[in-house]
Design a protein with these regions (language model features):
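Amphipathic alpha-helical segments used for helix-helix packing
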Residues: 48, 78-110
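Hydrophobic/aromatic-rich alpha-helical bundle segments in the mid-to-C-terminal region
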Residues: 100-108, 116-169, 173-180
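Hydrophobic alpha-helical connector segments
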Residues: 54-88
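Helix-turn-helix
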Residues: 4-42, 46
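Phosphate-rich cofactor/ligand-interacting catalytic cores and adjacent structured alpha/beta frameworks
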Residues: 51
Length: 180
């Protein structure tokens, strides 16, 4: 049920994904979904509780984190891959205040705060927030808006442009890249 809910919230957002839709995918009655989760809001909270964990990206050299994070967004399918994508679930659910609050909590608790602790140093929280903002902006422009330069650009070219900016937040130093 959770896998189906995650995929639906990614594809349709909170407002357009329903308990009946989840039940139909799984092949059960909607009452069973309610029995297990209590409400659509609780199903949503449980479905998106995981997904923002930066743990895997924090493994490896600190000097390569910007590139690893850029790739995490840019190598995803352009559009819907059919599975759970916490970035797209957040973007598509943001118009609903309660859903946005739940996602914001998850993002802060599972991504921004752990990343800030890992980054350390001056203004670590702001730097972690800026990294998250950049990643969400990339995901939004590439997968939702489908802006031509980002949606059709070569992954390696985009990573080469984005990674130094993200790395500057990791290092706590202004980016030295200049547009050409």
């Amino acid at each position: 049920m959770l896998e189906a809910a995650r995929a639906l919230f990614t594809r349709d957002g909170y407002d357009h994904a329903g308990v009946r839709d989840v039940a139909a995918i799984v092949g059960v009655d909607a009452a069973l979904v309610i029995r297990y989760f209590g409400s659509k809001e609780k199903l949503f909270a449980e479905a998106v509780a995981q997904g923002f964990d930066p743990g895997g990206y924090l493994e490896g050299e600190r000097s390569g984190l910007g590139e690893r994070l850029a790739r995490s967004v840019l190598q995803k399918e352009k559009g819907d891959g059919g599975g759970y994508d916490p970035l797209l679930a957040l973007l598509r659910s943001a118009p609903n205040e309660r859903a946005a609050a739940l996602l914001r909590e998850g993002l802060d608790e599972q991504f921004v705060h752990p990343l800030a602790r890992w980054l350390g140093g001056e203004r670590a929280s702001e730097r972690a927030g800026l990294i998250a903002a950049n990643l969400f902006g990339l995901a939004f422009m590439r997968a939702v808006v489908r802006s031509a330069p980002l949606a059709t650009g070569e992954v390696e070219d985009l990573v080469a442009l984005v990674a130094p900016v993200l790395q500057s937040y990791v290092d706590g130093k202004p980016s030295q890249t200049t547009p050409s």
